[in-house]
Structures are given as C-alpha cells and as structure tokens.
C-alpha cells in the first residue's frame, strides 16, 4: 500500500482503500489519496469529511478546521460540522475563533451540552477560571438524557478536579481525580492528572506510583512504541505523534517523571526519563518535552538550550514556565542585557507568566549590574517580606503541632518550604553583590542575619563555608561547615563537588590537621580507583583538583618548588586527568610562577625548570582536543578553534619560560 496513488487504485475500490487506511491508522497516506481526489471534486462532502477526520487524528488541527469550515459552508443545514470546526479550532489554540463558531450553536438544543463543555474548556485554557467554573456547574442540570448518570458524574468530577488544580487547591483536586478514577476504572490521561496533582502537592512518592503504572501499561500494551530504546543506545525510528501515543499518556508521564527527579536533584535520572520516552524526531516534539530537554541539558549544551527556549517563546501556546526560566537562565549565565531586552519586548507576558515575587527578583538581579546599591535595597525589601512570612508560618507549625492537627502541620510545612525556596535565591543575590567586591566580612554578616531560618539548609551552609574559607583566618570555622556536607555523602564521596573537598583539605592543612587531610585524600583515591576499575575510560578529576588546589596554596605562599611539583604530579596520567578545569588551575600557578620569575623575586633550580618544560610538553601532546576555555553559549564572536586548546596555551607558556630564562628554543 506504501506509495499508492489515486491513479493506481482500481475503479470502484477508492472508498474501500481509504477506509482500510483509516482503519489501520495510516492517516498520512489517506490524506495523500483524499487530497488528490479533492482536486478533482473539491466540493465532495465525503472527501472533505474524511480529510478533516484524518487531519484531526494527525493533530493537524488548523487544517482539520479548514475542512470543517468548507463543509459548514457547503452544507449549512448540518450544524455538526460547525461543532467539529469549533473543536478543531480549540485544539489548535485558536480560542477566539473557536468561541465565535461555538456561539452559533448555542440555540440548538441537540448541541447545547457539548457546546457548554467546549466553551468551559476554552475559558479554562484562556485562564478564565471563574467563567469556566460557571459553565461547568451548568452541565449536570443541562445534560439530562444525553448520557448515563455515572458517566455524567465522572465527567463532572474530572472537570472540577481540573479547576481546583488550576486554582492551586491540589489536595482537593487529588480527591476529585481519585474518585473519578475509582468510578471509571484505569484511564491513562486521568491517572496522569492524579499524578500531576500529587506532584504539585509535593507528594512525589504517590505521583511516581501512578506514573509507573502508566509506563508499565504503555510498555505492555504497546511494545511498538520503543520505550527505553534510546536510553539503551539502540538506533530506532521515530514513532511519530500518533493517536495511540497520545492515548497512552506516555509522553506526559515521562515528562512528569523527569520533573520529579529534577526536583529531587537526581539529574541523571531526570535526563534518563526524557530519553526513555518513545522516540520522535526533534521537529515532532511537543512544547513540554522541548522545554524539559532544554532545561535538563543546560549544563552540557547551553547554546542549544537557549535556542529551544527562545523558539518556544515565539510559539502559541508555550509551557507557562518558559518565560520565567529563560529569564532566570539569562541571569545565571550573566546575560543581563538579554534578560532586560526580553522583559521589555514581552511586557504583555509579565502579568500572565511571572509572579510578583519572580518579577521583583529578576528586576533586582538585573539592576545589580548598573546600580548595585539600589539592587541591594530592592532585594532587602524582598527578603524582609519573605522572612515575615517565614516567621508567621513557623508559629502556624508550632500551633498545629500543639493542637495535633496533622493536616494543618502538613499545609504549613509545605508553605514554609515553598517560601524558603524563594528566600534562599534572594539571600544569595544579596551576598553576591558583596562577594563580587571581595567584601567577605559583609557577606558573612548577611549570612549570619539569616541563620534563624537557614541553619539547616545545604545551600546556605555551603556558601557560609566558602565565605569563611575566603577570609583565610577562619579555616577552623570553615571546617565546621564543610565537614557535615562531606560526611553526609562519605559513602559516595565523588558526589561531593571537587572544590568542596579541596577546600576542606586546605582547611585541614592550614589548621595543622594533616592526618585528616591525608585520610580524606585516601578516601577519594580509593573511590576513584574503584570507579576506574568499573569504567576504565572515564575521566576523574576529584583527587586531581584537590592536589591542584593544595599546590596552588603553596604557590600562593611562595613555595613554588613544592607547589609546582604538586601541580605537575596531580595531572598524571594526562589522558585521564587533563581537562579544561584542571588546566585552568594548573596554568594559573604557572602564570604566577612566570610573573615572579620575570620580576626576579624568586629563583628556581634548573631541575624544576626542566620539570616544568616536560610537563608543558606532555600537556601539548595530550591537549589537542581539550578546550582551554569553555566559551559562553551566546557569544557572537567565537574564539579561534586552533587557539582555544590546551596544546596552544601550553606552547605559549613554554615559550614564555624560554624567554624569561634566556634559553634558545
């Protein structure tokens, strides 16, 4: 049947062939045949009706609406085509046009109930929740005789559940969806609604349970969808955006699973959830999947991530989180001018997609670049408002515990956690203003003011440790904050940031706790050896960075003989230890060494100089494909490919050594 044209079909068989294609869900082929037939008979009711149906099944809703519009004009007495046109326009997110067409059917009692449902759905999608609720509440009394009472009641539960969800009443929404699921039996889309409501109420375990059921049933009933194939590295064809895929709710389930894992900071599991979903070509991806791919691969592929988010912002509709996430990522990567431009160009989106908190936060962060004092005042106002909320919620939690009211405790604790998630970024933005000025005592002062709320928060503890470390006379206090972080992950120590381990080792050394430093380094070495045994080709940088930071410390103290030697040994073997980050630390020490040599403030033995030259030659050999600098993702002027390598920079450093010591190259 593949590639069959109208001319090849025997006389009298055309209709049978088209219906066979539709029965087998081969809608694209049916569209080809029908398109050719309609060129010969453009007013064919059967042809237009089947073409509209096929377009609808292919989710080409705008094209389906055009077919039904033509049918409505050709056969105005058949109002069902207006209803189909309105439904297709709604699916195409053309809400104003859908409302206009649906309004024409309101006076027909046969369609009244379905039109009310459609109007309620349109208002829901437009964000008019009171209008949608008003229409939903009319439905039960209007539907008498059209459907069985059980189905009618289930639909009512689902509709109210959706409204409650949009209104932020997630627990109540869960109850409605759960009741509907019990009444109707398993339905993938309804099970997904329940999982989404659980997710929004932070009941991740319950959400994952329903997601697992959707995935298991999808795999069992439709193995042809290729779930998990991409993750396993199997090259598979796109399954397309078929009706079957839509009915399984697999795409929605995997996206929600990715979001939960991302929230729980299980970033690898989040990425795996996205690759586990049925394979589709990039141009076939839905907006939510595209948004999540951009977000979860941002660290590895930031340029691609920005392109996807910018593309989504031009679509209608786009995931509501897109606008805020793009602005936050611009600020994270310090593209403050771009963030300001996007805000200015999309002023109409601010009220709809940014909460007052997020807008005020972004405004303050962008202001930091030109008026840090003004920005600090804005952030201080925001912090003051949030601390007031935190105090009130603390009292509510205490009162609820006193009254043994579990529901009130749960509600207050959830609100407290949500407020804390807003407060921490504001606090860090305030601290960053003084951090950039290297005014570390002021940063410490800001953190001390927040100890009442943040003393158990990992991000706060980590940054307190960093600011104490940077003051150079508070290593003992820094240990008090670094140690709990490291001990928390001691069994999987490579999950701890290398710089945290390095700073803790330096703090131990600076407080004469050399045994503790050595023990920690042995632990890291043992973990890396085990990992190397399991995956011999994997590069590991933790111990290398620890040694580099220790070497840097000795260089900073003027002990270049020992410091440079430590730096050189830390990068052996070069094929596993040399990378962009490790080269960054190493070259800083060499540049400091060369600066002091050129000023004649230090003298090095010939053997040390020879060791330096040999080291740079090794880096030259192994660094051909290693970038010396990771370029910013949106830079207009890209660095020269040949110059942005460890090889090129190591040659430059070697040439400088020869020039300073007067050797001939």
From Swiss-Prot:
GO terms for cellular component: axonemal microtubule; ciliary tip; cilium; intraciliary transport particle B. GO terms for molecular function: intraciliary transport particle B binding. SUPFAM superfamilies: TPR-like. It comes from the Eukaryota. GO terms for biological process: cilium assembly; intraciliary anterograde transport; intraciliary transport. It is found in: Cell projection, Cilium. Residues 508-535 form a coiled coil. The keyword Repeat applies. Keywords: Cell projection, Cilium, Cilium biogenesis/degradation, Coiled coil, Repeat, TPR repeat. InterPro entries: TPR-like_helical_dom_sf (IPR011990), TPR_rpt (IPR019734), TT30 (IPR039941). Its main location: other. TPR repeats lie at residues 11-44, 45-78, 154-187, 189-221, 393-424, 425-457, 459-492, 544-577. Residues 130-154 are annotated as: Disordered. Interacts with the IFT B complex components IFT27, IFT46, IFT74, IFT52, IFT57, IFT80, IFT81 and IFT88. Interacts with KIF17. Belongs to the TTC30/dfy-1/fleer family. Required for polyglutamylation of axonemal tubulin. Plays a role in anterograde intraflagellar transport (IFT), the process by which cilia precursors are transported from the base of the cilium to the site of their incorporation at the tip. This is Intraflagellar transport protein 70B.
């Amino acid at each position: 049947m593949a590639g069959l044209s109208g001319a090849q079909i025997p006389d009298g068989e055309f209709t049978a062939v088209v219906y066979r294609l539709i029965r087998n869900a081969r809608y694209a082929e049916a569209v080809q045949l029908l398109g050719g037939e309609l060129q010969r008979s453009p007013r064919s009711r059967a042809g237009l009706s089947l073409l509209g149906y096929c377009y609808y099944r292919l989710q080409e809703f705008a094209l389906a609406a055009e077919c039904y519009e033509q049918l409505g004009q050709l056969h105005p007495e058949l109002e069902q085509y207006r209803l189909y046109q309105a439904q297709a326009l709604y699916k195409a997110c053309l809400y104003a046009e859908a409302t206009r067409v649906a309004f024409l059917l309101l006076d027909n009692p046969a369609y009244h109930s379905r039109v009310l449902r459609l109007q309620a759905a349109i208002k829901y999608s437009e964000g008019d929740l009171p209008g949608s609720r008003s229409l939903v509440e009319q439905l039960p009394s209007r539907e008498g005789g059209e459907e069985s009472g059980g189905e009618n009641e289930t639909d009512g539960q689902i509709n109210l559940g959706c409204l409650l969800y949009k209104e932020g009443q997630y627990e109540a929404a869960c109850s409605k969806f759960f009741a509907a699921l019990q009444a109707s039996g398993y339905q993938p889309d309804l099970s997904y609604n329940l999982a989404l409501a659980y997710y929004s109420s932070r009941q991740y375990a319950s959400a994952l349970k329903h997601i697992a059921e959707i995935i298991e049933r999808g795999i069992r009933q439709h193995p042809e969808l290729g779930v998990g194939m991409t993750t396993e590295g199997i090259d598979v064809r796109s399954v397309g955006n078929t009706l079957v895929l839509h009915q399984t709710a697999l795409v929605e389930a995997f996206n929600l699973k990715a979001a939960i894992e991302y929230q729980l900071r299980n970033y690898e599991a989040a990425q795996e959830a996205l690759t586990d979903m049925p394979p589709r070509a990039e141009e076939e991806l839905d907006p939510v999947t595209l948004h999540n791919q951009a977000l979860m691969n941002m660290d590895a592929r930031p340029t691609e991530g920005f392109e996807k988010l910018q593309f989504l912002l031009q679509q209608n509709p786009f995931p509501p989180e897109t606008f805020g996430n793009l602005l936050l990522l611009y600020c994270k990567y310090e593209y403050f001018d771009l963030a300001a431009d996007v805000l200015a160009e999309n002023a109409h989106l601010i009220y709809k997609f940014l909460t007052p908190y997020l807008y005020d936060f972004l405004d303050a962060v962008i202001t930091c670049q030109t008026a840090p004092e003004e920005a600090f005042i804005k952030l201080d106002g925001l912090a003051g408002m949030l601390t007031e909320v935190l105090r009130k919620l603390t009292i509510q939690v205490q009162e609820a515990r006193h009254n043994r009211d579990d529901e009130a405790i749960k509600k207050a604790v959830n609100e407290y956690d949500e407020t804390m998630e807003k407060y921490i970024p504001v606090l860090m933005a305030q601290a960053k203003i003084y951090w950039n000025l290297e005014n570390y005592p002021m940063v410490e002062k800001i953190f001390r003011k927040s100890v009442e709320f943040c003393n158990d928060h990992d991000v706060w503890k980590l940054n307190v440790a960093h600011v104490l470390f940077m003051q150079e006379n508070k290593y003992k206090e820094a240990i008090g904050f670094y140690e709990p972080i490291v001990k928390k992950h001691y069994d999987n120590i490579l999950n701890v940031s290398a710089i945290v381990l390095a700073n803790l080792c330096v703090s131990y050394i600076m407080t004469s706790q050399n045994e503790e430093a050595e023990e920690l380094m042995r632990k890291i070495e043992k973990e890396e050896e085990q990992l190397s045994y399991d995956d011999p080709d994997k590069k590991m940088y933790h111990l290398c960075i620890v040694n580099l930071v220790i070497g840097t410390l000795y260089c900073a103290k003027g002990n270049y003989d020992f410091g440079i030697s430590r730096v050189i040994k830390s990068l052996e073997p070069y094929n596993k230890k040399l990378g962009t980050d490790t080269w960054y630390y190493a070259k800083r020490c060499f540049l400091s060494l060369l600066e002091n040599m050129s000023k004649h403030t230090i003298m090095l033995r010939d053997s040390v100089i020879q060791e330096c030259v040999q080291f740079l030659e090794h880096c030259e050999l192994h660094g051909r494909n290693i970038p010396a600098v990771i370029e910013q993702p949106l830079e207009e002027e890209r660095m020269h490919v040949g110059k942005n390598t460890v090889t090129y920079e190591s040659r430059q450093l070697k040439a400088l050594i020869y020039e300073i010591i007067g050797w001939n190259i």
